């Protein structure tokens, strides 16, 4: 498997020319890099005006590998070829490196780039990327991979230290300024022409620099809001190493790389809007920075959030008064680490009464709103304390816990809440303090512990009786001034005391069932399953030409092909009593087929959009301006890899995708709407683009002779 690395943007607060003077002192050898033994110049080129300098070196490295491995390989040193291209006019240095030794067995590529900071011309930016692909190595492939990754990661952050070392050396020698390159004197006519070109070039570059700085500043990534509140982003957005340290914490080079690569994937598949970096990092931590696993659970969570509109829960949902009066929980200052502190007096809470009065779904939604509020408070505390705070502390007081709390429907509701929170809010719990645990607690713990992740379980601290008042107790985690009064503290805690819910507020099972359906059917999205040979199709009837069909769908599982067809006659609706050729029901959603098998493309119906291939995890939005009235069919079809692809080596992502859809089943979540031409007050030309940015991963949809459209991926 190919190992990849991508660094964040590292900033030197020194001019580009001074950084280059420090960089050149690394050659022909560098005592600060023990493995870098020597280097020889293979070729060198300098342009007449001195603006371009290209030099190729052969570098000799002494890799710290087991003696047996070196003996089997038959080498003591490893050689790399490095090509440096310095453009003093543009103030850039591009470094390309690859291995010469064992190049037929191991493929190593590295690219580094020094550029001028887009917002401050006296600062310098550095980026680095690399890939490692071990084809074969005498049966020691895994060992060689570990050695290579160990050496590479240990030297990544050394690069900045080495540059800073030589900068200090230059300063000691009295060199604090290196003049910029200037072109040699030229004639008056050439000067005018050159000036004109420079002005034009600068005018073109300014917008790009501004776009890059939007990503570097991180301002839009750290604004208050929910965890997956959309953040506008472009492929040019890049993470600054200083921003990562300030807002996300200390990460290892490989952890930084995982964050950047997963973020880039989201930018490609959710073009324009991506989740916040803190949210992405939580899912990576939950899966030990395994990108594939983190991507899978994060895509599922993003789909879940979108389907149930969790992003807007704090603004659009008001908790019932029963919850405000009898749910004994609330936010209470922060712990010693700056984490928001949530206090829950579970022992004083009538779980049976709450379930009977509100139902399971209302309780779940209230817990979700608490988690959303916790994410907001984490962002606020990050700004207040000047350090990354990505989780909160929960204090649970169990005084009063008894067998009433083990009521079976109540425990069932608790287990469901735990399951949903674990899946969609990973790594948000920093510490759980369980106080005054009674004898009945082990019974409850036995029921719920199997549903709690091992990493989360390690954050639990359980105190029986008054043990929390002794050494290693509450004072180790919470300041004395904010210990709640009901725990013999001095701080008044504004948390409802709970108590029994009056039976007059209880509701019948039918009422609760209807309320539960109402809560979770407020979503405007529908789910559908797509099978191999059984696409899902929906029918839209258009009365007036120039209407606008809009769609928004997420590919939850597998890869699909999206098509739009037009027909002058209506297809036969599927029979409800027959599941044969027309419809299939499945737990994952409906499957409806409208196009009759006897229909012929071009005679009975026509294609008005080029087929669009959508990969798993993509979020797609688009629109189509209709040319004629009639019936339009939107189709999601199972995507089959072309047969010719079998002759080429498959990519890892394709292999994984083929394994995931081995059951020949895909799942989409979609929403469609028709806007009449008289109701659309925007510019019609904005919808009549001849090129569609539907997906960066597939060919652009173009306007056919029959239709005009505009599409885009968005999150």
From Swiss-Prot:
Question: Which ranges carry the GOLD domain?
Answer: 521-674
Chain positions with Phosphoserine modification: 586
What InterPro entries is this protein classified in?
CRAL-TRIO_dom, CRAL-TRIO_dom_sf, CRAL/TRIO_N_dom, CRAL/TRIO_N_dom_sf, GOLD_dom, GOLD_dom_sf, PRELI/MSF1_dom, SEC14/CRAL-TRIO_domain
Positions the record marks as coiled coil are none
On the tree of life, the source organism's domain of life is Eukaryota
Q: Supply the CDD domains for this chain.
A: SEC14
Modified-residue entries (Phosphothreonine), positions: 234
An example GO BP is: negative regulation of RIG-I signaling pathway
Annotated stretches, region: Required for interaction and inhibitory function toward RIGI: 1-510
PRELI/MSF1 domain residues are 3-175
* An annotated GO cellular component: cytoplasm
Q: Where in the cell is it found?
A: Cytoplasm; Golgi apparatus
Query: Which key words are in the record?
Result: Cytoplasm, Golgi apparatus, Immunity, Innate immunity, Phosphoprotein, Signal transduction inhibitor
According to the entry, every stretch annotated as the CRAL-TRIO domain falls at 319-495
GO terms for MF? protein sequestering activity; RIG-I binding
Q: What does this protein do?
A: May play a role in innate immunity by inhibiting the antiviral RIG-I signaling pathway. In this pathway, functions as a negative regulator of RIGI, the cytoplasmic sensor of viral nucleic acids. Prevents the interaction of RIGI with MAVS/IPS1, an important step in signal propagation. May also regulate the SLC18A3 and SLC5A7 cholinergic transporters.
Task: Give the record's subunit note.
Answer: Interacts with RIGI (via tandem CARD domain); the interaction is direct. Interacts (via GOLD domain) with SLC18A3; the interaction is direct. Interacts with SLC5A7 (via GOLD domain); the interaction is direct.
| Full protein name | SEC14-like protein 1
> What is the gene name?
Sec14l1
């Amino acid at each position: 498997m190919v190992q990849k690395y991508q660094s964040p943007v590292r900033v030197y607060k020194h001019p580009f020319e001074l950084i280059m003077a420090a960089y050149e002192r690394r050659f022909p050898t560098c005592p600060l890099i023990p493995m870098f033994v020597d280097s020889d110049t293979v070729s060198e080129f300098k342009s007449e005006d001195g603006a371009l300098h290209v030099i190729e070196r052969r570098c000799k490295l002494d890799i710290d590998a087991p003696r047996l491995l070196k003996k089997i390989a038959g080498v003591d040193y490893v050689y790399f070829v490095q090509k440096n291209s310095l453009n003093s006019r543009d103030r850039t240095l591009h470094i390309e490196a690859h291995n010469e030794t064992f190049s037929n067995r191991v493929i190593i590529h590295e690219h580094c780039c020094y550029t001028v900071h887009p917002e401050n011309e006296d600062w310098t930016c550095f980026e680095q990327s690399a890939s490692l692909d071990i084809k074969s190595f005498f049966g020691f492939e895994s060992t060689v991979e570990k050695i290579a990754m160990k050496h590479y990661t240990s030297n990544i952050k050394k690069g900045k230290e080495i540059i800073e070392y030589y900068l200090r050396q230059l300063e000691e020698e009295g060199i604090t300024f290196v003049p910029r390159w200037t072109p040699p004197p030229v004639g008056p006519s050439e000067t005018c022409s050159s000036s004109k070109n420079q002005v034009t070039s600068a005018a073109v570059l300014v917008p790009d620099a501004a776009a890059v700085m939007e990503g570097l500043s991180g301002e839009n990534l750290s604004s208050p809001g929910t965890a997956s509140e959309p953040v506008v982003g472009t492929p040019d957005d890049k993470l600054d190493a200083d921003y990562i340290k300030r807002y996300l914490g200390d990460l290892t080079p490989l952890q930084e790389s995982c964050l950047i690569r997963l973020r880039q994937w989201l930018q490609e598949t959710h073009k324009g809007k991506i989740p916040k970096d803190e949210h992405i990092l939580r899912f990576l931590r939950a899966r030990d920075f395994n990108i594939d696993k983190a991507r899978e659970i994060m895509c599922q969570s993003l789909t879940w959030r979108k389907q149930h509109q969790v992003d807007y829960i704090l603004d659009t949902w008001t908790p019932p008064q029963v919850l405000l009066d009898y749910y004994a929980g609330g936010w209470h200052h922060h712990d010693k680490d700056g984490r928001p502190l949530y206090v829950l007096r579970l022992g004083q809470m009538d779980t049976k009464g709450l379930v009977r009065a509100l139902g399971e779904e209302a309780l779940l939604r209230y817990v979700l709103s608490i988690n959303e509020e916790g994410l907001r408070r984490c962002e606020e505390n990050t700004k207040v304390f000047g350090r990354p705070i990505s989780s909160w502390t929960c204090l649970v007081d169990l005084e009063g816990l008894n067998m009433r709390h083990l009521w079976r429907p109540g425990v069932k509701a608790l287990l469901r809440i735990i399951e949903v929170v674990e899946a969609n809010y990973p790594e948000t719990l920093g510490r759980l303090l369980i106080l005054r645990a009674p004898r009945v607690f082990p019974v409850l713990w036995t029921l719920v512990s199997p549903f709690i992740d091992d990493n989360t379980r390690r954050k639990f601290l359980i105190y029986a009786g008054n043990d929390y008042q002794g050494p290693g107790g509450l004072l180790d985690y919470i300041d004395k001034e904010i210990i709640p009064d009901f725990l013999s503290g001095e701080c008044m805690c504004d948390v409802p005391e709970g108590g029994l819910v009056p039976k007059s507020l209880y509701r019948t099972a039918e009422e609760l069932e209807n309320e539960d359906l109402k809560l979770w059917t407020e979503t405007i999205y529908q789910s559908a399953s797509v099978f191999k040979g059984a696409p899902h199709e929906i029918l839209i009837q258009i009365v007036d030409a120039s209407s606008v069909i809009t769609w928004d769908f997420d590919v939850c599982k597998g890869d699909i092909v999206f098509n739009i067809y037009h027909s002058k006659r209506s297809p036969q609706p599927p029979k409800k009593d027959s599941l044969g050729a027309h419809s299939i029901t499945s737990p994952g959603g409906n499957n409806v087929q409208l196009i009759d098998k006897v229909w012929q493309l071009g005679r009975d119906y026509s294609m008005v959009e080029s087929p669009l291939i959508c990969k798993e995890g993509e979020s797609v939005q688009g629109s189509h301006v209709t040319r004629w009235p009639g019936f339009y069919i939107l189709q999601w079809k199972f995507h089959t890899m072309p047969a010719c692809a079998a002759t080429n080596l498959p990519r890892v992502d394709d292999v994984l995708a083929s394994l995931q859809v081995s059951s020949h089943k895909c799942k989409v979540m979609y929403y469609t709407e028709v806007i009449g031409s008289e109701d659309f007050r925007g510019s019609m030309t904005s919808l009549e683009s001849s090129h569609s940015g539907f997906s960066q991963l597939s060919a652009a949809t173009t306007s056919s002779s029959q239709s005009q459209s505009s599409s885009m991926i968005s999150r």
